[in-house]
Design a protein with these regions (language model features):
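Conserved short hydrophobic patches within well-ordered secondary structure
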Residues: 23-27, 46, 88-93
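Oxidoreductase cofactor-interface core, primarily capturing Rossmann-like NAD(P)-dependent enzymes
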Residues: 38-41, 52-137
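Active-site beta-alpha turn of Rossmann-fold NAD(P)-dependent dehydrogenases/reductases
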Residues: 7, 44-47, 81-83
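Generic hydrophobic/packing signal
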Residues: 35, 47-50
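NAD(P)-cofactor binding segment of oxidoreductase domains
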Residues: 2-6, 11-43, 61-72
Length: 137
């Protein structure tokens, strides 16, 4: 079995910051090492628009660390950054609610349908590596 393109997606876990960073760094290092051995020609990773501006969040620090590993590797790559998915809105609202109080984020939110992101990732994966970041919003 051989692969010319690898897609990665990491789910946000409700875990401590250290665990998230460690998971994304370890899994990304392992994946990149195996891709190098296999001669993979295109690593595609899904990330979030604004990651570099939200480093006070452990999740976004972890995503930034993941992106840095990818950009620092020898594997040609495309990082696809998207806004949060419409499908996550209920979970975000539930997480932000305590009793009858809702904490509103200071960040702007511009959700996108997961299907639209999947289509964009597919198009990018089938193309040549951009060795950079593509934003889908």
């Amino acid at each position: 079995m051989s692969f010319s393109t690898i897609l990665t997606r990491s789910a946000k876990e409700r875990a401590c910051i250290f665990s998230i960073v460690k998971f994304l760094e370890t899994s990304t290092r392992n994946l990149l090492a195996q891709e190098a051995k296999a001669g993979v020609g295109h690593h595609v990773a899904l990330s979030v628009i604004g990651t570099e501006r939200m480093l006070s969040s452990g999740y976004f620090r972890a995503k930034m660390a993941q992106e840095n590993l990818i950009t620092g590797s020898s594997i040609p790559y495309s990082i696809v950054r998207a806004t949060q998915f419409f499908e996550f809105v209920k979970g975000i609202a539930d997480f932000s609610t305590e009793g009858n109080k809702v904490r509103l984020p200071s960040a702007l939110i511009q959700p996108i349908a997961a299907d639209d992101v999947a289509s964009a990732v597919g198009r990018i994966a089938m193309g040549s590596p951009v060795n950079g970041t593509v934003e889908v919003d």
